[in-house]
UniProtKB/Swiss-Prot annotation:
This is Putative mitochondrial transporter UCP3. Disulfide bonds: none annotated. The chain crosses the membrane at residues 11-32, 77-99, 120-136, 183-199, 217-236, 271-293. The keyword ATP-binding does not apply.
Length: 311
């Protein structure tokens, strides 16, 4: 079947770390417009006065993308990409690259099988660790994605990615770069469990029952299932996180206040705003990322083995 075959030696932690960050950046490059559309749909309706002043209304994934291209230009779909890539190199490297190592750490000595609880603990741990390191990049990414640039008074607040870090720190304090870290930790712990644990289990069962071999089709099916589960369980927290991180100072007192206002003003369905682009983005992102990740691990191990070989 297509793809590199597994290496004789299991991949090292450093190989997984590098492969995860690189694969996540590649997945971001391909799916970033869907992520931007998701952010626009999630924040739509949170400020009715601002919404009424906008000429652009978003309806559905394709409608959002087409509206953005028409009113802001195609480059708007990739607004915040630099921060997004910075985020993945610091975020995915930890939550994906260290997952197996943390899973082994939680697995009791003498056991050759990791329980579901062990995998969930590993997913929560690496997800929380990754957010703690990458939170400022996520804040900047969302600020860029949420801002409209129409040329009709929609001037850019930030001249670039580094200017965004400096401006947020100057105007909102250093804490502004860590705004929404609690809902983000919650969201990414859930997403990481949904992604890594589901991928781990589906892949394991497909191989145990000899339904597929350890190659592209197996990785594709496992990644698609992981993307759906992650979107389903994490969407409510993701909407709250996006709105809170994008909000101006004083709009919400806390993530909990943001959640209450969403329920009272828009109803419980607001928690699943942007679900379709979330799934399209997370599902496609997972497929691209995990397939690339598996192949990169094998390629890097082959390079390492060739380098270590005396001949």
């Amino acid at each position: 079947m297509v793809g590199l075959q597994p290496s004789e030696r299991p991949p090292t932690t450093s190989v997984k770390f590098l492969a995860a960050g690189t694969a996540a950046c590649f997945a971001d490059l391909l799916t970033f417009p869907l992520d931007t559309a998701k952010v626009r749909l999630q924040i739509q309706g949170e400020n009715q006065a601002a919404l009424a002043a906008r000429s652009a209304q978003y309806r559905g994934v394709l409608g959002t993308i087409l509206t953005m291209v028409r009113t802001e230009g195609p480059r708007s779909l990739y607004s915040g990409l630099v921060a997004g890539l910075q985020r993945q190199m610091s975020f995915a490297s930890i939550r994906i690259g260290l997952y197996d190592s943390v899973k082994q750490f939680y697995t009791p000595k003498g056991s050759d099988h990791s329980s579901i609880i062990t995998r969930i603990l590993a997913g929560c741990t690496t997800g929380a660790m990754a957010v703690t390191c990458a939170q400022p990049t996520d804040v900047v990414k969302i600020r860029f994605q949420a801002s409209m640039h129409t040329g009709l008074g929609g001037n850019r607040k930030y001249s670039g990615t580094m200017d965004a870090y400096r401006t947020i720190a100057r105007e909102e304090g250093v804490r502004g770069l860590w705004k929404g870290i609690l809902p983000n930790i919650t969201r990414n712990a859930i997403v990481n469990c949904g992604e890594m644990v589901t991928y781990d289990i589906i892949k394991e069962k497909l191989l145990d029952y000899h339904l597929l071999t350890d190659n592209f089709p197996c990785h594709f099916v496992s990644a698609f299932g992981a993307g759906f589960c992650a979107t389903l369980v994490a969407s409510p927290v993701d909407v709250v996180k996006t709105r809170y991180m994008n909000s101006p100072p004083g709009q919400y007192h806390s993530p909990f206040d943001c959640m209450l206002k969403m329920v009272t003003q828009e109803g419980p369905t607001a928690f699943y705003k942007g679900f379709t682009p979330s799934f399209l983005r997370l599902g496609s992102w997972n497929v691209v990322m995990f397939v690339t990740y598996e192949q990169m691990k094998r390629a890097l191990m082959k390079v390492q083995m060739l380098r270590d070989s005396p001949f």
